[in-house]
Regions:
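Contiguous, well-ordered beta-strand patches that form the walls/edges
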Residues: 61-100
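Bacterial N-terminal signal peptides that target proteins for export
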Residues: 1-8
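Bacterial N-terminal signal peptides
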Residues: 9-17
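Short, solvent-exposed loop/hinge segments that bridge or flank secondary-structure elements
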Residues: 25-63, 100-102
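Short, exposed beta-strand-loop hairpins at the edges of beta-sheets
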Residues: 99-117
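Short, solvent-exposed aromatic-acidic interface loops
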Residues: 34-38, 67-74, 114-115
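Edge beta-strand at a domain terminus
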Residues: 113-127
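Sec/Tat signal peptide C-region and signal peptidase I cleavage site
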Residues: 19-23
Length: 127
């Protein structure tokens, strides 16, 4: 067997295995918003003070379950079946008015409603 194939195989196995043990159901994430803004129905842009928040990845509820403080106080975001890979630290959640995307510690959220649009980004760490 050629040395290049061995090295390529080892590198591939390390890459594939590196994220698998890093995340799973039951993990708790602590997040700090990097941007938070809204657009009113009149088209006015409003910038909000970035907040901290936390959530747990709950397998029983198939959801992101948020803590008791902050913008997402006690909210439950149901994960999208077929677009949820906790072991790879990547998932999507959505409902009638909002969409959430999470991958490798990056959190993106948008909500549309009768009062306008809310959009935010955050960096999250697992503890």
């Amino acid at each position: 067997m050629n040395i290049k194939k061995i090295i390529a195989g080892l590198a591939l196995s390390m890459l594939m295995g590196s994220g698998v043990a890093n995340a799973d159901w039951g993990d708790v994430y602590y997040c700090q918003m990097t941007n938070s803004l809204g657009i009113t129905v009149e088209g006015e842009i409003e910038r909000y003070k970035p907040e901290k928040f936390q959530f747990k990845l709950d397998q029983t509820k198939n959801a992101m379950v948020f803590g008791s403080t902050g913008m997402f106080k006690n909210e439950v975001f149901e994960l999208v079946i077929g677009r949820t890979w906790p072991s790879q630290e990547a998932w999507n959640a959505s409902d009638k008015y909002s969409m959430t995307y999470f991958e490798f510690g990056k959190f993106l959220f948008t909500r549309n409603g009768s009062l306008g649009i809310t959009s935010l980004s955050a960096n999250c760490d697992k503890f």
